Amino acid sequence: KHGHKGREWGAIIADPCCLGACLAPTLPVSLPAAGGLPTEFSSAQFRAALGMFATGVAIVTARGAQGQPVGLTISSFNAVSLEPALVLWSLGHTSTALGIMRQASHYAIHVLTVEQRALAERFATRGIDRWAGVAHQPGRSGAPLLAGAAAVFECRNRSQYVEGDHTIFVGEGLHCTHQPHSSPLLYHGGMFYTEHPLGRVAESALG
């Protein structure tokens, strides 16, 4: 999602196919011919509608060619596969981090807790040193790791797909950790939220 002026966010991928990873077998797909019905909404309307899909908030980190740490806030994180362990996220082509993320061999995705709201805003702000005063250490692949995240996925930069004005990154999980009782930082309609438990999901509803 995109934040307010001066903020740089990864875009949303609104994928309501299931609550877990989408594990249906791969089947041949017939795609419709190009063209079809014209678009009947503006970019602003499309963005506002996508904003109704509540997401978590994450920070992706990597290292540039000179070893410098790079990081940005995203809300496009999603599961792809359990076997192999694959995740995806997307980044707009106007992002200053795009070139580095395309070239990085590995990156780390940090799923943020409610206590990390300030960190989410910091890594979404342009024109500042996002790493000033931020403690981090190298992970197994060398990507910078931030402390306190609800979950961390260290990934190989497995594949990339250009679609429209974004690049979709598919990462292969090499290592992951999580804190099972942490409260998540959520993003919906341009505002931050946290959880309000309604009860466990029925087993029959899990994908």
Pin down the residues of each PLM region:
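Short hydrophobic alpha-helical segments enriched in small aliphatic residues
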Residues: 3-5
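Basic, polyanion-binding surface patches
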Residues: 15-207
